[in-house]
Every structure is written in structure tokens, then in C-alpha cells.
């Protein structure tokens, strides 16, 4: 029997360094505090909706939030987002972040996503002990990357499953955090529905600091929009829409990969 379309909600738990990109100085303690506040709001929505999510966490965040890592509900998946969000050494950070997360959580960590969806060599990811990665956004983001020729569907390559972030079937409109934040909900919902119907899965990703109050920072409107609580309500509405319409099954990325391996 074929599985229902998979709805994969993911969040990149990291230091809130977005103000640094726009010239605002923010120390590590404040970065972590903003991420904690936003993550609390996100997880509250997820908990109330009783759906699982996949948490890609940096080693730095984990080191400073050990109790949260230990207490994380087992229905959620813990995966790696590298050790630091601001810089990356594939020869050390891939392995060290996985080992740290496993030590703190007592769980096996099999998934990886690179900060800012940047490319990492599959050989390095595989050597560090991962089963899958989700660092590909198969679209064009000016100034970031151009993956217009990349697969929009999951694929197995060089010993790893690659689970792309979702884009629409037509025109490859990215259904990433900026789209959720800036598109009217009715349009974003329709894009998600079309993508689930055509691709059979939906891989959405968010950041905890999006759900915190960012009004004190000099960020562009398209980055800070919804940070005073509106985005929390929007996420609630989106999940409720998926549930009421019966559009698919909420699942962790690890379990989705298991389905792929089993050919379902």
C-alpha cells in the first residue's frame, strides 16, 4: 500500500546571527537568547498540533541548551546543522556535531543540513556517519545559489539520500522560510497543496529566531515580517489547513528516508 504524501516540518536551530548580515553587532549570548525565545513559540505550536518535526541543531546551540536537548520529545527527530552557524570545517564539524548531539541526547543522529543551504561534498557527509542530507534548495536564489537544474525530488547519490527543500512543480518557486513569511497564507497554502499532489512530499524549513521579536534590529522588512507574533498564528493556520484537508502525513525526515529505502 502506497504511503500518504509526506509533510516534513523542519527547523534549523542555530545562533541568531541574521543581524550580523546587516551590520548590527549582536553577541553570542543574545543570539542564543533570541533563538530560545523563538524556538519556544515554534515548539508550542508543534506540540499543540501534535505533529512531529525534524530539528537540525548546531553544536553551539546544543552546548548551551543541554537540558532542552535531553528533554526533547522522542517523536521529534534531532539532526545536525553543523557545529557553528557562522563558519564550517567539513573535516571536523560534521563529525563533532553529530557526536555531540548523540552524546547529549542519547539518540542516533543520521541527518545533516548545511547552514544557509550551502553545498557540502557528499563524501565528507558520508564519512562523518550520516544517512541523508537536506541542504539542496533546487531553485535560484540571487546571491546565494543557482540549482535550477537540480532534482526537485529525493534521490540517492554517492551513498546518501538527498532530500531537497520543496519548490513548486512549475517555475520552482521556493517554499522556504522567506516565502512563508512574505506570501499571503492562501497563496502559500495552494503552493504547498500543488507540491504535495505532484511531488508526493513537502519539505518546509524555518528558523527559531523568525518567531522571536526582531523589531530592535535594523533588518529588511522581508526578513523581519511577522516577528511580533503574526508568524506564530500563520504557522498554526498552515498546520491546521494540512490536517483539515487531509493533505498528507506529518513525518520526520528520518522516517521519510526509511520509507524511500523500503520503496514505499
Q: Which functions belong to the PLM regions below?
A:
Residues 26-33, 58, 82-89, 109-110, ...:
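The substrate-binding groove and active-site-proximal loops of carbohydrate-active enzymes
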Residues 103, 107-205:
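Active-site-adjacent pocket scaffolds in enzyme catalytic domains
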Residues 39-43, 66-70, 94-98, 122, ...:
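Generic structural signal for well-ordered alpha-helices
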Residues 2-74:
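Active-site beta->alpha N-cap acidic-glycine motif
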Residues 12, 46, 55, 81, ...:
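Conserved, mostly hydrophobic/aromatic
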Residues 44-50, 185-264:
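C-terminal domain-boundary segment and adjacent tail
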Amino acid at each position: 500500500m502506497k504511503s500518504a504524501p509526506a509533510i516534513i516540518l523542519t527547523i534549523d536551530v542555530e545562533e541568531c546571527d541574521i543581524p550580523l548580515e546587516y551590520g548590527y553587532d549582536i553577541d553570542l549570548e543574545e543570539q542564543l537568547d533570541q533563538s530560545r525565545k523563538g524556538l519556544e513559540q515554534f515548539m508550542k505550536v508543534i506540540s499543540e498540533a501534535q505533529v512531529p518535526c525534524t530539528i537540525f541543531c548546531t553544536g553551539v546551540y546544543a552546548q548551551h541548551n543541554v537540558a532542552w536537548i535531553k528533554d526533547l520529545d522522542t517523536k521529534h527527530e534531532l539532526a545536525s546543522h553543523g557545529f557553528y552557524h557562522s563558519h564550517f570545517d567539513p573535516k571536523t564539524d560534521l563529525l563533532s556535531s553529530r557526536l555531540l548531539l548523540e552524546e547529549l541526547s542519547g539518540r542516533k543522529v543520521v541527518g545533516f543540513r548545511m547552514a544557509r543551504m550551502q553545498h557540502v561534498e557528499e563524501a565528507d557527509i558520508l564519512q562523518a556517519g550520516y544517512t541523508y542530507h537536506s541542504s539542496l534548495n533546487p531553485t535560484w536564489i540571487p546571491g546565494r545559489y543557482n540549482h535550477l537544474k537540480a532534482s526537485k525530488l529525493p534521490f540517492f547519490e554517492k551513498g546518501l539520500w538527498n532530500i531537497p527543500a520543496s519548490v513548486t512543480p512549475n517555475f520552482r518557486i521556493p517554499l522556504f522560510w522567506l516565502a512563508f513569511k512574505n506570501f499571503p497564507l492562501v497563496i502559500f497554502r495552494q503552493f504547498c497543496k500543488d507540491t504535495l499532489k505532484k511531488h508526493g512530499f513537502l519539505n518546509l524549513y524555518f528558523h527559531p529566531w523568525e518567531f522571536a521579536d526582531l523589531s530592535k534590529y535594523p533588518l529588511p522588512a522581508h526578513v523581519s515580517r511577522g516577528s511580533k507574533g503574526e508568524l506564530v498564528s500563520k504557522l498554526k493556520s498552515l498546520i491546521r489547513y494540512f490536517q483539515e484537508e487531509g493533505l498528507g502525513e506529518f513525518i520526520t525526515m528520518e522516517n521519510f528516508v526509511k520509507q524511500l529505502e523500503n520503496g514505499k
